Amino acid sequence: MTTKLERLIDQGVGRIPADIVLKGGSFFDLVTGEIVRSDIAIGADRIVGTSGDYRGETEIDISGRTVVPGFIDTHLHIESSLVTPHEFDRCVLPYGVTTAICDPHEIANVLGTEGIEFFLESALETIMDIRVQLSSCVPATHLETAGADLPIERLLPFRDHPKVIGLAEFMNFPGVIHKDSVCMAKLDAFQGGHIDGHAPLLSGNDLNGYLSAGIRTEHECTSAAEALEKIRKGMHILVREGSVSKDLAALIPIITERLSPYLALCTDDRNPLDIAEQGHLDHMIRTAMASGVEPLAIYRAASISAARAFGLRDRGLVAPGWRADLVVLDSLQSCRAEMVFSAGRRVSDALFATRKPVAPIGLDSVKARPVNAAHFGVPVAEGETSVIGVMPGKIITEHRRYRLPAKGNETTVDLTNDIIKVAVIERHGKNGNHANGFVQGFGLKKGAIASTVGHDSHNICVVGVNEDDMAYAANRLGEIKGGFVVVEDGKITGEIALPVAGLMSIEPYETVRDTLHHLRQAALALGATLHEPFLQLAFLPLPVIPHLKISDRGMVDVDKFALIG
């Protein structure tokens, strides 16, 4: 009886036909930078031959096409696609993303270990290779109320799961630097494994201390200077381009052939509408090359460099013995996937149909107390008021200060300066907390927008001009079991239900995509000026990203890591 290994060797030598042979095309050699005209032979889940003439049980003509290794998204939260892992697989794999390294941080903050188990079970069924990093900071800080708590004792049972790739983004960098005991326990347990970083603007000796904990990758760089310091200190930089956080343009200067071994690509948070309109990592690759980046540099970052950064030694090259994750492109410059292979399987609707479904969880996670307009009042204060300053395309916000108008004994919105109200309402049934503040930069002239997607604890976050509309929008989220709601003059003008932990839809991604298009139009009707108002809203409660945020406990000065007043 011939073993699988013996069969692969025979196919590579050419003694027997390969399972699949891609004929007539070329491949991009990411070692030499050459375009090599060659057949590509596939046996089972791996490449068995290149630079030769092969016979195959199935032969596919790819004349005029160029093959590259499958793309690797090195850091993302699948929940931000607003669909389940199965639908994410079906949505993104056709764009050439054959490996996704995800942090189920969002669902873990709502449901704890049940959320991690859901992702691991899903990862065993998807066609795309989904790898899971264990969420390191649940809750992210003591400055908010999460639905769950994940001490090291609850993470350790998952550490050796075949789909687990290490410890996810360690956001509590002050806790690392100051040797917080909870942080130390988690870091100590994963020494020798992969620990993902999250340290925006951290520099100098503080960065040295953070890296001394064994942290090796970083996706929060927003400038070339920041990225270069971190590369010099041994980090791999994951260049990010999501629906909100758009750092690619700022990091173009570092995407060079010399630095490409220390670079990878990631999306972090990207919704189905943007994926449908622009693409996924393929969009990043096209954009980079249009900005003057050499193809060798960006394609390395998209595959082999990413694989090496995370210890995935079996993928990232078109070469014999390597995993057959392949993308057949019309050309390198256009980066349009015409055909995708995942572990030797040609991606198709029929292949997706073979997956075992995984039942949704967390369908009753929204337990917020009802609110009314009075809950959104802000008492008049002497002097200036702290205002969250939104920066389009960034999740970093500014700490701005304004003298705001008053009506009676309450501070009101200032539409002339684009300042409206923002509130966060605890929705896990823990304490009923409710905090109010002000935000600048949404462009709203009327109405309200509310969401149960609110990083990282995913309480209800609502922005608005009218307190009655804010209350209506917040209460409606409980009725639909989570999601996004747009209210204008007492009427719901757009909504999407996200009943899986208040984060993900149970509908196909096409339905979510189309509904998001309508939601954008509803937000624009309120005056919204942001490209992605819903995900921008979702980052207002994130107290680990500078400089000013809001949680269910109040306004947070992130630089001081403390509540304001």
Swiss-Prot record:
One of its GO terms (molecular function) is adenine deaminase activity. CDD domains: AdeC. It comes from the Bacteria. It holds the Pfam family Adenine_deam_C. Its cofactor is Mn(2+). InterPro entries: Adenine_deam, Adenine_deam_C, Amidohydro-rel, Metal-dep_hydrolase_composite, Metal_Hydrolase. Transmembrane segments: none annotated. This is Adenine deaminase 1. Its EC number is 3.5.4.2. Belongs to the metallo-dependent hydrolases superfamily. Adenine deaminase family. The lineage of its organism: Bacteria, Pseudomonadati, Pseudomonadota, Alphaproteobacteria, Hyphomicrobiales. Keywords: Hydrolase, Manganese. It is an enzyme of class 3 (hydrolase). It comes from Rhizobium etli (strain ATCC 51251 / DSM 11541 / JCM 21823 / NBRC 15573 / CFN 42). GO terms for biological process: adenine catabolic process. It catalyses: adenine + H2O + H(+) = hypoxanthine + NH4(+).
